[in-house]
Amino acid sequence: MIVFDVEADNLLDDATMIHCLSYTSDGMNYKTLFDYQDMRDLILSQRGLIGHNIVRYDVPLLEKILGIKITARLFDTLPMSWVLNYNRPKHGLESFGEDFGVPKPKIDDWQNLTREEYAHRCTEDVKINWLLWKDILKRFMFIYKDKKELDKFFRYLEFKMDCAATAEQIGWKLDVGLATKCVADLTQQQSDKVEELMTVMPKRKVTAIKRKPKVCFKKDGSVSSNGERWFNLLDEQKLPRHYDGEVTVVKGWNDPNPNSTEQVKDWLYSLGWEPCTFKFNKNKETGKEKKVPQVRKDGELTESVKLLIDNNPSVAVLEGLTIIQHRLAIFQGFLDCERDGYVKAEIDGLTNTLRFKHKKPLVNLPGVDRPWGKEVRGCLTAPEGYILCGADMTSLEDTCKRHYMKPFDPEYVEEMSQAGFDPHLDLAKHAGAITQDDIDAYNRGEKPELKALRKNYKVVNYSATYGVGSPKLSRETGMSIKQAQALLDAYWQRNWSVKAFVDAQKIRTINEEMWVQNPVSKFWHSLRYEKDVFSTLNQSTGAYCFDKWVAYYRKRRSNIIGQFHDESINLVREGEQNEHSDALNWAIEKLNEDLKLNVDLGIDIQYGQRYSDVH
């Protein structure tokens, strides 16, 4: 097994040649190959290959240029670092080189330098990655202790990176014409909305500082012209004439700037805004975190800002502008990233639950039920002769939650599994806010006024499971803290089994970092706070179940062009829908047989020409 790196004349899509391949098997002796046949002989003789981002770059590059098929085990230190170094802002070899005292040589020209210069860069990368691999392996062994369990986890990371690499290589057809039209339309709408917002935001006061003149009196003792202006100003400000400090005066009023975050926040604060969403910025020098209130999240106003709209309709203008700007950025991102009529579903990391972090342009896409969602998803289409299949696991997180609850509270889980069960109205009933007769009437369409009540209990159902407290719930819903606490109390009375499950889990602390083991996958997951135990285990179980389903499916078909949370987007030849559905259903059956969860997992399958047709 070797640690290796390659240098080529370009990125994967445009590379035409490999300059060199450097490697080591012991961290002491480093060799560099320039001959393609030597590279083939070396790579094909290895049972295992270690590298940084090799699944998505080095390996497909070698296969493309050398015309070989690599079957060795792949140990990719990039996703390993994502898991272990979860607070690290950069995971590139240059960053690790600074840590290890091995500077990464800087090269900007990949066509015209000598092969010795490329070889030097390549060798230094291998030195850095050897040190990184040794560090990662040692730290993972502290967590897993069992080599078989760790090997299973490494295989899992290899699989996930292979899924990402395959999707990137296939690409996703983009309707360039539709994206271009939407950019033009939204650019005009943005301009109109900015002008409208300027009419409802308060004007900005322009001030100046006035100071007492050096000479206020003439030689004859009379007041000078400068002195007269100063004393008049003091009189206007109702200040005594002996005052000699600074005076702030209003010079005029400027139009507001809707693109100024500071001005928008000042306006919202004047309306009684109480922020519920924050970003934490860390000071690199002091290490202290600064809590920054957020007006927007994922392209929409935060819940606490939306609460202002009922009493301040002008805030709805800000909501409209926020949505327009977010959607415009998506369409523009499509066009910026388009290449030969395609975009890629690229990844940018892993969460602590091992879900993909997605990368521009396919990130945070609004659903078809949201403003411009149909157009956004409608830009992603299938090429001629193909159709898209959207396959997602139905109620994945809720199913995983019921799996963990059932050993403690089987009666409630059975009730939750009944057709037509509404967890939000059930919680309201359990809290004494409504009766079963009210729920039945609502389901018949006779009590539409319960919709607002249901919305609040829906927020509680989703957020309480993940550790929300009454102050934050109050800010998000507009309820008093007392009301919010009452809802949380009702939730935990109904869902006591969640806490019972959490209490049964063991948290390990290693070098001041907390880790918890998933009971289904047996993988270890990092924890920031103890309150995150259930959310981490529930979401990671969902991610693992989804990935296992995808793994079974890929044994029959490898045509996935995108994965988002609990859905997979597959490219299918027209006329093969039945065979494709058979493969998806076979995969979920195999998964249920394999995992034997307390609640069976299910899937939903839809076909269409555009992403908007299938999800």
Q: Can you say where each PLM-predicted feature lies in the sequence?
A:
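Function-dense linear segments that define catalytic or interfacial modules
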Residues: 346-445
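Active-site-proximal helix-loop-helix substrate-binding element of RNase H-like nuclease domains
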Residues: 12, 16-23, 27-36, 42-142, ...
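Short hydrophobic/aromatic beta-strand micro-patches
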Residues: 569-573
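Short active-site loop/helix that positions an aromatic residue
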Residues: 21, 55-67, 82, 264-272, ...
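Conserved catalytic core of nucleic-acid polymerases
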Residues: 165, 223, 343-344, 348-351, ...
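Cytochrome P450 catalytic domain signature, combining two hallmark sequence patches
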Residues: 69-72, 191, 273-280, 405-418, ...
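Conserved "right-hand" nucleotidyltransferase catalytic core of DNA-directed polymerases
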Residues: 1-7, 104, 115-372, 381, ...
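Short amphipathic alpha-helices in soluble, non-transmembrane regions
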Residues: 580-588
